[in-house]
C-alpha cells in the first residue's frame, strides 16, 4: 500500500502489456487488467461485484462489463438451482426448468458475443476461460478452437508481446492435436471396405 489511509495501492510492475491482478475486498474478487503507467480508481456502493466501477484502464473497464454480467448471471442460476430442493408441483418444476434453461443460454450467448465483439482485447482472453458451474467447454467441445483462434489472431495485432497470447497459442496447439488424434481414432474404427457389386465386381 502506498497510503493505507487513502486506500491507495502501488504496483511496481512496469509491464508494457496489461497483466491480470485480483483485488479481494470483503470476501469478493475483482479482476483487473493493468499495465505500467495505469492510474486506476475503483469504486463501489453496496454489493461490490454488482456495482463496482473502474476508471483509468480501458482493459479493466472492458473486463468489468463482462465479469459483472457473467457473475450476476451465474449467481442467478445458483439461486434458481436451490429452488429445486423445495417441494415443487410438476407445473412449478417445469416452469423453473424453463426459466433456468433460458437464463443459462442467455449467459452463454452473451459470453460468446463479448468474445467476438472484443476479440482484440485481453478481456476476451479472460472471458474465453470462464465456465458456468458444471461446464467443461466454452461452447461445444472441439468447435471451441474457432473462438480461441479468432482471439489469438486479433491479439497478434493488438498485443503481439503479451504472454497471454503465447499461452493462448499453446492452448490452440493442444486443442488441434486433440482434434487430430480424435479424428485418427475415429477413422481407425471405421476402416474402408471394398465390396463387390451384385455381379461380383469391385
Regions found by a protein language model. Give the residues of each.
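Single conserved hydrophobic/aromatic residue that forms the stacking wall/gate
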Residues: 1-7, 11
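Oxidative protein folding and maturation machinery
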Residues: 12-201
